[in-house]
From Swiss-Prot:
It comes from Rickettsia massiliae (strain Mtu5). Its EC number is 3.6.5.3. Keywords: Cytoplasm, Elongation factor, GTP-binding, Hydrolase, Magnesium, Metal-binding, Nucleotide-binding, Protein biosynthesis. Its main location: cytoplasm. This is Elongation factor Tu.
Length: 394
């Protein structure tokens, strides 16, 4: 069946369902599509179709993820749902599914459980900006006092991990009732989508952020100077703009004297473009792959940071043995590898393949870095882990 193409006139937001196993994430995802399909905002997608999530590879890591899309009056959404807990951990750490916001699903019958906590913590670590709560399975709870208690617990948990627990909208409903077409079930879904529309902030578009381009290659063109190539990650670069070359060495200032794409000269390059940028007065040997071009003052080089990391299992082609303190692999940032030393927290002796962990890293050379930057951990050319910078330490 051909997919109906959505008109992309509305602002776009990436979202996902998170929460403990069997609390109803996939049922809720199905219910959203089925309720919104009635007003033409989605293609109704059954639970089984979402649950049979295809496997995808992101930086050598196998992740099962289901994608659905739908729209409300105000926005167009791409929604991710994962079948297993490990898939969430991998997804959030690798950024395979970029989330501008999340719907935390908590079963009213069980209250917050271990993975509820872990997903809230992960969301905080990887920088998910906001979340809305769906208190599911309320049809199984007869006592209103119990519902109130669960809601209080959820709010306390959110506050504990740095989310505004008192402000976050909590919608009570039953995904099952919505799937069965019961009016109270559908009403809760509509209420949830209104909350998501109003509470999850509109993400800043890549072109509105400061200019940043990771350098992939450097050429010398006789009579014209040095050209660096790469894909613009964010912002816009115009001919005549002053820029900085950041990372690996001391930061240098230069000016962009030309932008070209597909051998044509342009006035500007913007986020998503693969461009060549001509640099005034910069020698070929002063620039290298792994540095970035950036708007002056927008990003700094750092060599010490804290990270949340997923370590590949043996089956995924990762290590067969755990690693301990002072492990020294390569950290692959954007376009290059830098050696670094891992310092584990005092209470952790080792990290097992298939685990996720928080630890500190010290690189031998600084990299242009900001919180939220993703990286891979490599050993002898193969990927053994994936991580995200959660805090910069120097």
């Amino acid at each position: 069946m051909a997919k109906a193409k959505f008109e992309r006139t509305k602002p776009h937001v990436n979202i996902g369902t998170i929460g403990h196993v069997d609390h109803g994430k996939t049922s809720l995802t199905a219910a959203i599509t089925i309720v919104l399909a009635k007003t033409g905002g989605a293609q109704a997608t059954a639970y089984d179709q979402i649950d049979a999530a295809p496997e995808e590879k992101e930086r050598g890591i196998t992740i099962s993820t289901a994608h659905v899309e739908y729209e409300t009056k105000n926005r167009h959404y791409a929604h991710v749902d994962c079948p297993g807990h490990a898939d969430y951990v991998k997804n959030m750490i690798t950024g395979a599914a970029q989330m501008d916001g999340a719907i935390l699903v908590v079963s009213a019958a069980d209250g917050p459980m271990p993975q509820t906590r872990e997903h809230i913590l992960l969301a905080k670590q990887v920088g998910v900006p906001a979340m809305v709560v769906f208190l599911n399975k309320v049809d199984m709870v007869d006592d209103p006092d119990l519902l109130e208690l669960v809601e209080m617990e959820v709010r306390e948990l959110l506050s504990k991990y740095g989310f505004p627990g008192d402000e976050i909208p909590i919608i009570k409903g039953s995904a099952l009732q919505a799937l069965e077409g019961k009016p109270e079930g559908e009403e809760a879904i509509n209420e949830l989508m209104d909350a998501v529309d109003s509470y999850i902030p509109q993400p800043v578009r890549a072109t509105d952020k400061p200019f940043l381009m990771p350098i992939e290659d450097v050429f010398s063109i006789s009579g014209r100077g040095t050209v660096v190539t790469g894909r613009v990650e964010s912002g816009i670069i115009k001919v005549g703009d002053e820029i900085e070359i950041v990372g690996l060495k001391d930061t240098q200032k230069t000016t962009c004297t030309g932008v070209e794409m597909f051998r044509k000269l342009l006035d500007e390059g913007q986020a998503g473009d693969n461009v060549g940028i001509l640099l005034r007065g910069t020698k070929r040997e002063e620039v290298e792959r792994g540095q970035v071009l950036a708007k002056p003052g927008s990003i700094k080089p750092h060599d010490k940071f804290e990270a949340e990391v997923y370590v590949l299992s043996k089956e995924e082609g990762g290590r067969h043995t755990p690693f301990t303190n002072d492990y020294r692999p390569q950290f692959y940032f954007r376009t290059t590898d830098v050696t670094g030393t891992i310092k584990l927290p005092a209470d952790k002796q080792m990290v097992m393949p298939g685990d996720n962990a928080t630890f500190t890293v010290e690189l031998i050379k600084p990299i242009a870095m900001q919180e939220g930057l993703k990286f891979s951990i490599r050993e002898g050319g193969r990927t053994v882990g994936a991580g995200v910078v959660t805090k910069i330490n120097n």
